[in-house]
A protein has these predicted regions:
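Predominantly soluble domains enriched in secretory-pathway, periplasmic, or organellar proteins
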Residues: 13, 20-387
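Bacterial N-terminal signal peptides
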Residues: 5-16
Length: 387
């Protein structure tokens, strides 16, 4: 039965072409393994990047019905590296969370969640998976964050948060969970010890402030859900909304960085005082964020700008803006050694998706490899010695 669920397993042995390394660049010392989900054709790929370049190590198609598109949106690897979890956005009426082994892509379990499950993260102890129910196509009503007990794949609670929640990130201790509300123009903080919303923060320019509890439906920022394009819609003249798409805690948990997709900047919030400390300019349509573990760099994908911004956190200065291979930059995963950023790029039309690999020392793209259409969710697995 598990084999039927997995679909076809494909193995690709050829390495993709590698960009020439500049004077500051050097070949990787080990081999880096990354999982990426392609929403356009239901494929999950394992990317291997090493001294010889980047390649698709293996890939498989999710589901049992080749005519039914499940739409894998988010992907997250467990802290012990034994499993990865995938959200599928499509369903009748709701989507689901799937659990696979990293070693062989074997299906371990599946659980139905809310409408359009999207971004997810596994808690640092591996016990729970936090999934936002994005509800992209539904009515403008309060949606939720699902909390799934990972061992048995059981949804233990569904926490009401806001309208169109997106992004799902925990601080390093796992005590606070952060997501954003595209329709409420807000950041939401969940106390994971209580499984409830503790605070929210309004992100609209000129109106920034924090409050206790969740945002209300009445606090919507005036977006039209029917017109939302998941981060691809530019702001209209005079529009001061943030339209947040991601929240990224700093390495020490003292700050939270929020990607404002419409205002093209990143809001930095001090967690202790729950106040805004600055707005950091980025490229056009900043979408997803990743932070290095040493607390030095912030990496943002620019969905409309076909680029990636690398920002020095201390100064707020954009150190580099690096073009992506194709349009619609999406997800980003940073290697545990802070050496590389792996960026998923959706592409447009019949184009394949792409994973671009950026050297965070040389600040340049050093490799690219094609994957399935609409590559989005991406997460790091492990580093292994080069042969």
């Amino acid at each position: 039965m598990r084999t039927a669920w997995l679909g076809l397993l494909l193995v690709t042995g050829a390495y993709a072409s590698v960009a020439r390394l500049g004077a500051q660049g050097r070949a990787p010392d080990g081999e880096y393994l990354v999982f990426v989900a392609s929403e356009g054709n239901d494929r999950i790929a394992l990317i291997r990047f090493g001294p010889a370049g980047a390649k698709v190590e293996r890939d498989h198609r999710m589901g049992i019905n080749p005519t039914e598109l499940l739409g894998p949106h988010g992907i997250a690897v467990s802290p012990d590296g034994k499993y990865y979890y995938v959200t599928t956005a499509h369903g009748t009426p709701n989507g689901a969370l799937w659990k696979f082994t990293t070693a062989r892509d074997s299906l371990v379990g599946r659980v139905d969640l809310g409408a359009f499950p999207a971004t997810l993260q596994v808690s640092p102890d591996g016990a729970y998976v936090y999934v936002v129910n994005f509800n992209l196509y539904g009515d403008p009503v309060t949606s939720s964050v699902s909390v799934v007990y990972a061992d048995q794949m059981v949804e233990v609670t569904r926490i009401p948060t806001c309208v169109m929640p997106h992004g799902s990130r925990l601080n390093a201790l796992g005590t606070k969970h952060y997501s954003v509300c595209m329709m409420n123009d807000a950041l939401v903080e969940i106390d994971t010890r209580q499984f409830g919303v503790s605070r929210h923060f309004l992100l609209t320019k000129g109106k920034e402030h924090g409050m206790s509890g969740p945002p209300t439906v009445a606090a919507r920022a005036g977006h039209d859900m029917a017109a939302m394009s998941h981060g691809s819609e530019p702001p209209k003249p005079g529009d001061l909304t943030c339209s947040p798409t991601w929240a990224q805690p700093s390495a020490d948990g003292a700050k939270v960085f929020v990607a404002c997709n419409k205002s093209n900047d990143i809001v930095e919030i001090d967690v202790g005082s729950w106040t805004m400390t600055r707005r950091i300019p980025t490229g056009d349509g900043v979408y997803n964020l990743g932070a290095t573990r040493d607390g030095r760099l912030l990496v943002g994908t620019n969905k409309r700008g076909q680029s990636v911004s690398v920002i020095d956190i201390a100064s707020g200065k954009e150190l580099a803006r690096i073009s992506t291979t194709r349009k619609v930059a999406s997800g980003v995963a940073i290697s545990p050694d802070d050496r590389y950023a792996f960026v998923s790029v959706e592409g447009v039309g019949s184009q394949p998706g792409t994973v671009d690999i950026i050297d965070l020392v040389g600040l340049q793209k050093v490799a690219s490899v094609d994957v399935g259409q609409q590559a989005g969710g991406i997460d790091f697995w492990k580093i292994v010695p080069a042969p």
